[in-house]
A protein has these predicted regions:
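Helix-boundary and loop/linker segments of multi-pass membrane transporters
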Residues: 72-77, 112, 202-210, 247-250, ...
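Hydrophobic alpha-helical segments and their helix-loop junctions in multi-pass secondary transporters
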Residues: 51, 92, 96, 100, ...
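Helix-loop-helix module between adjacent transmembrane segments
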Residues: 34-131, 219-227
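Transmembrane alpha-helical core residues of multi-pass small-molecule transporters
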Residues: 11, 39-43, 87, 122-125, ...
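Membrane-interface helix-loop-helix modules in multi-pass membrane proteins
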Residues: 2-63, 208-227, 231-239, 244-287, ...
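Interfacial loop/helix-cap signal at membrane boundaries in integral membrane proteins
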Residues: 3, 7, 182-208, 292-298
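Small-residue-rich segments of transmembrane alpha-helices in multi-pass membrane proteins
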Residues: 3-8, 73-77, 81, 145-159
């Protein structure tokens, strides 16, 4: 069903790096990192432009197509193999390693497990489940964990806002935004440039180097296009189908799932980023020590 596809795309994108990294960035830089989560509209390009293309090749080649398969078909065997190698190396260095690291930190803080036990255990358990359960198992787990993740994260957000506002969520929101506006991102000139907005336009703004005006949105769009429309980790969740299923049925389901995933993609701003900002505001009031912003979501 389309809602399973939407949940699977969303769950494929969410990992421990969001719980640790996105919340930590929120505690340090406010909503500057939210521009990555605003790229959900790219998933619509996957559903409307790329799924028909992939499905056409599926019918022609008789199997689920990956981008390396397409390059082998369109150009040469070597071209597709090189993309596979580059993608594998990139995933190990930028995705798997980061997920293992942040997962180890989170489990160490939450359960008291030694860092390496948590990091390696996370990789081993994920591998076992994927090998034994296959794509069907992954999709089923995604459908189960997505609502749990959303409900649990919003519960953390509301409890944090209530703690900040002395029992009032609305007061907590006001205090959090005021802290982001006046106490975060203070320049060398003593001026508070604020961390309650995504774009930083002036070079005197300390966060300009990390979030240089509108260019950061352009850069995120280019990377988002690659990730959401060509990355096999995402694409394979859209193209799941029964043997002999009609093209229009596959594409209609994929497009509906893409729409659902696009809406889901906005949620991490509220699920992870803003709880980090709440943690920073609570730490400023002396509620706890947060010298390590990576622990923002856990605390």
């Amino acid at each position: 069903p389309w809602y399973i596809i939407g949940a699977a795309i969303f769950a494929a994108n969410i990992g421990s790096e969001h719980l640790v990294g996105l919340a930590g960035t929120g505690a340090k830089s406010g909503v500057g990192m939210a521009h990555w989560e605003m790229q959900g509209w790219m998933i619509l390009l996957l559903g409307w432009l790329f799924v028909p293309f992939y499905q056409l090749l599926n019918n022609k080649m008789g199997k689920i197509i990956t981008m390396p398969d397409f390059l082998k078909y369109r150009y040469t065997q070597r071209t597709g193999s090189w993309l596979s190698i580059i993608t594998l190396i990139a995933y190990i260095l930028t995705k798997v390693s980061v997920t293992a690291y942040t997962g180890g930190i989170f489990l160490e803080f939450l359960l008291g497990l030694p860092f390496w036990y948590g990091a390696i255990g996370l990789i081993v358990l994920t591998g076992i489940f994927t090998v034994l359960g296959g794509m069907k198992g992954v999709m089923t787990l995604s459908a189960i964990q997505t609502p749990i993740l959303i409900i649990g994260s919003f519960l953390v957000l509301f409890l944090g806002l209530a703690a900040l506002g002395g029992g009032s969520i609305s007061t907590g929101w006001t205090e959090m935004m005021e802290h982001a506006r006046s106490a975060m991102n203070v320049g060398a000139d003593g001026h508070a440039y604020g961390a309650n907005h995504m774009f930083h336009w002036t070079e005197s703004d300390p966060m300009y180097q990390d979030y240089p005006g509108f260019w950061v949105f352009i850069g995120a769009s280019i990377i988002g296009f690659w990730y959401w429309c060509t990355d096999q980790h995402i694409v394979q969740r859209v193209l799941g189908q029964r043997k002999g299923e009609a093209n229009d049925v596959v594409m209609k389901r994929a497009r509906r799932g893409s729409i659902a995933a696009g809406y889901f993609k906005i949620l991490p701003v509220f699920m992870f980023l803003i709880p980090g900002m709440v943690a920073a505001a609570l730490a400023a009031k002396g509620e706890f020590d947060m010298s390590n912003t990576d622990a923002a979501f856990a605390v």
